[in-house]
């Protein structure tokens, strides 16, 4: 019997090392056959540009992170060229080890106290009008990092009074009430928490998470802040059925969620969960129509849609796909 990996504090574990720590052994760490990408998934990525280099430089200068880079998002160049970025606070090491995600796992260091001020100044320097703030899971913190979110919101608005802030939060497992209380006075303009997949697949896709808990988090935030839109997103192509996705959409509406993102799952490496199916664009269009019929005010649905993809346009209700 092999010895478990002894994690060192502050060290990033990725790919095979990260997957070896998954407690649920119901998937291979390396898939034997990789589905070939269909034509609609083959896009030419934009070349690097001064705008991309400037954003990366600003983040490096202040020791900030973007989920765009840490999670290897395929839309990085497009979003950076558009002048938008999703900042990832509380470090770049996650206490969870979800097998779909490319963010590193490990034992994170203590949050940087000056990060909210650095983030606010960077956003001011970049002249952003809409910003998305997300984080790794921080199960090592008493409030899951919620107070840090609130501090970031406060500092960002102090330097950028006209800005709109969207927060894409973790589930604050076991700390929901404490987390919501921490954010009570400094809520975002859009509150986003992703369900990611159908409840049947949670054990495989989101080990350690709970479907109903995530729904309750969205509902309780909405009850506290009825004028703040709530938002959630799902990945397609992990083995779910269309019927299961429709049921999730109904659950989201029953818990007050009005904004939705649906996108194609892409495996970050051969060590991650494999893509079970590439969902045709027409199916995304059909699900969008269903979502609007169910009462979502905005639904961004398409192969390359991600939860923060053109989030500024999503918040305005413009077409995103």
UniProtKB/Swiss-Prot annotation:
Q: Which cofactor does it need?
A: [4Fe-4S] cluster
Cofactor note from UniProt? Answer: Binds 2 [4Fe-4S] clusters per subunit. One cluster is coordinated with 3 cysteines and an exchangeable S-adenosyl-L-methionine.
Give the matching SUPFAM superfamilies: Radical SAM enzymes
Report if keyword Metal-binding is assigned: yes
Q: Which residues bind [4Fe-4S] cluster 1?
A: 68, 73, 79, 308
- State the pathway, as annotated in the record: Protein modification; protein lipoylation via endogenous pathway; protein N(6)-(lipoyl)lysine from octanoyl-[acyl-carrier-protein]: step 2/2
Q: What is its EC number?
A: 2.8.1.8
Question: Where is the protein localized?
Answer: Cytoplasm
Q: What is its main location?
A: cytoplasm
Q: Which reaction does it catalyse?
A: [[Fe-S] cluster scaffold protein carrying a second [4Fe-4S](2+) cluster] + N(6)-octanoyl-L-lysyl-[protein] + 2 oxidized [2Fe-2S]-[ferredoxin] + 2 S-adenosyl-L-methionine + 4 H(+) = [[Fe-S] cluster scaffold protein] + N(6)-[(R)-dihydrolipoyl]-L-lysyl-[protein] + 4 Fe(3+) + 2 hydrogen sulfide + 2 5'-deoxyadenosine + 2 L-methionine + 2 reduced [2Fe-2S]-[ferredoxin]
Keyword Cytoplasm tagged: yes
Spell out the family assignment given in the record's similarity comment: Belongs to the radical SAM superfamily. Lipoyl synthase family.
Q: Which PANTHER family match?
A: LIPOYL SYNTHASE, LIPOYL SYNTHASE, MITOCHONDRIAL
What is the designated name of this protein? Lipoyl synthase
Give the organism, scientific name: Aliivibrio fischeri (strain ATCC 700601 / ES114)
């Amino acid at each position: 019997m092999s010895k478990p990996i002894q994690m060192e504090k502050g060290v990033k574990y990725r790919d095979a090392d990260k997957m070896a720590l998954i407690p649920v052994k119901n998937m291979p760490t390396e898939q034997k056959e990789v589905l070939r990408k269909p034509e609609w998934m083959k896009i030419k990525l934009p070349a690097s540009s001064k705008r991309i280099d400037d954003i990366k430089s600003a983040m490096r200068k202040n020791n900030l992170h973007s989920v765009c880079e840490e999670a290897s998002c395929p839309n990085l160049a497009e979003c950076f060229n558009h002048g938008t970025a999703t900042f990832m606070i509380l470090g770049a090491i996650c206490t969870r080890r979800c097998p779909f995600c490319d963010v590193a796992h490990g034992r994170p260091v203590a949050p940087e106290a000056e990060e909210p001020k650095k983030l606010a100044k960077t956003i001011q320097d970049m002249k952003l009008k809409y910003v998305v703030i997300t984080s790794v899971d921080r199960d090592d913190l008493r409030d899951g990092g919620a107070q840090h979110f609130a501090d970031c919101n406060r500092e960002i608005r102090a330097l950028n009074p006209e800005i709109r802030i969207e927060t894409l939060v973790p589930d604050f497992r076991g700390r929901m009430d404490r987390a919501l209380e921490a954010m009570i006075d400094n809520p975002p303009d859009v509150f986003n928490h992703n369900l990611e997949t159908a409840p049947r697949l949670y054990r495989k896709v989101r080990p350690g998470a709970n479907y109903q808990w995530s729904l309750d988090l969205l509902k309780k935030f909405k009850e506290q802040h009825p004028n703040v839109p709530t938002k959630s997103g799902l990945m397609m192509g992990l083995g779910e059925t269309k019927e299961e996705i429709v049921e999730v959409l109904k659950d989201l509406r029953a818990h007050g969620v009005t904004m939705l993102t649906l996108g194609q799952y892409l495996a970050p490496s051969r060590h991650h969960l494999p893509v079970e199916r590439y969902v045709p664009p027409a199916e995304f269009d059909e699900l969008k129509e269903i979502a609007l019929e169910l009462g979502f005010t905005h639904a961004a649905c398409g192969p390359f849609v991600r939860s923060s993809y053109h989030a500024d346009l999503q918040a305005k209700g413009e077409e995103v796909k």
